[in-house]
Swiss-Prot record:
Residues the record marks as carrying a glycan: N159, N208
Source organism (scientific name): Mycosarcoma maydis (Corn smut fungus)
Domain observations: The extensive loop region (ELR) is specific for fungal secreted chorismate mutases and is required for the interaction with the host defense kiwellin KWL1.
Keyword Secreted included in the entry's annotation: yes
Oligomeric form and interacting partners: Homodimer. Forms a heterodimer with the host cytosolic chorismate mutase CM2. Interacts with the host kiwellin KWL1 which acts as a defense protein that protects maize from infection.
Coiled coil ranges: none
Name used for this protein in its record: Secreted chorismate mutase
Length: 290
């Protein structure tokens, strides 16, 4: 859903408001409109990452195996082609809250961030459950602790084959790491837009002196979480995965569970890590609450 507010709201303020109060209200409304427009654009950009991520996973899976020494070559390729976020995000990653999302070089940011276990071992992941809905977000005890381990586990599930072209395989592996990192790092500018858009809501949490830092973070995450929107994203990802992995006559099938792994990447890692980045960035803005 688009968040932009009609410009007629501003016209109404100027027509019926009075004096400085109307001017202040008009400025506040204008700031919310601008923040809503930014948020719309950033959400569109977030959605644009879905198809490239899915296609890259499918392309890598379609090669049919893993090359000898592929993991070592991926690290070497990352060293030669380091991922560089924008200057603003790079600066934030050097702060206390942003440092949690840095990765061991040469890995790109956020791919080693450890998400908490929030689901039970036997959680139903992709079917409606009475009283619990569908598509629960988060990690189970048996899931790898971070995205890098998850992608490594997916790679190791492929049979080793000397016929797989190493350069092609490594190129796709590196591209996937860059894509998932870039996708979750969009959480930072999204957080700035959400803070401006819901300034009073977040400042009510940030200025509450009875809450600890961890409690504030938990409340911010609760404020940010929109499970309906998460379900929409995961439903779309599931549909895209099925459509893009359609097999034609005499095609060799994708490795088992390829579609499940795509959904799990978004469900257990991409969505919750993006939310964690948003929450950490908003927590940094307490000094902007007046």
């Amino acid at each position: 859903m688009k968040l932009s507010v009609s410009i007629f709201v501003l016209l109404a303020v100027s027509a019926f408001g009075g004096g400085s109060a109307a001017a202040v209200s008009g400025k506040s409304e204008a700031a919310e409109i601008e923040a809503g427009d930014r948020l719309d654009a950033l959400r569109d950009q977030l959605q644009r990452y879905e198809t490239p991520i899915i296609q890259t996973i499918l392309a890598r899976s379609a090669l049919g195996g893993r090359a000898p020494s592929e993991q070592d070559e991926v690290r070497a390729a990352l060293s030669r082609n380091a991922f560089e976020p924008s200057e603003v995000i790079s600066e934030w990653l050097q702060t206390e809250s942003g440092a949690r999302f840095r990765s061991t070089r040469p890995l790109p940011p956020a791919v080693e961030f450890i998400t908490p276990v929030v689901l039970s071992r036997d959680t139903v992941l992709d079917k409606p459950v009475v009283g619990k809905g569908i598509f629960p977000i988060g990690r189970r005890p048996q899931d790898p602790t971070n995205m890098d381990e998850f992608l490594d586990t997916s790679l190791l599930s492929l049979n080793q084959s000397s016929t797989v072209d190493l350069a092609s395989a490594v190129s796709l592996d590196v591209s996937l790491l860059h894509l998932v990192s870039a996708r979750v790092l969009l959480g930072y500018p999204i957080a700035l837009a959400k803070f401006d858009w819901l300034h009073d809501n977040f400042c009510h949490i940030l200025t509450n002196t009875t809450l600890s830092k961890s409690q504030k973070l938990a409340n911010i995450i609760q404020q940010l979480t929109d499970h309906k929107q998460e379900v929409n994203v995961l439903s779309r990802v599931e549909q895209k995965s099925k459509s893009l992995s359609h097999l034609f006559r005499n095609d060799i099938p994708y490795p088992p569970h390829t579609q499940d792994r795509i959904l799990r990447l978004f469900q257990a890692y991409l969505i919750p890590i993006t939310t964690q980045i948003e929450a950490a960035a908003i927590l940094d803005h307490a000094n902007k609450c007046t």
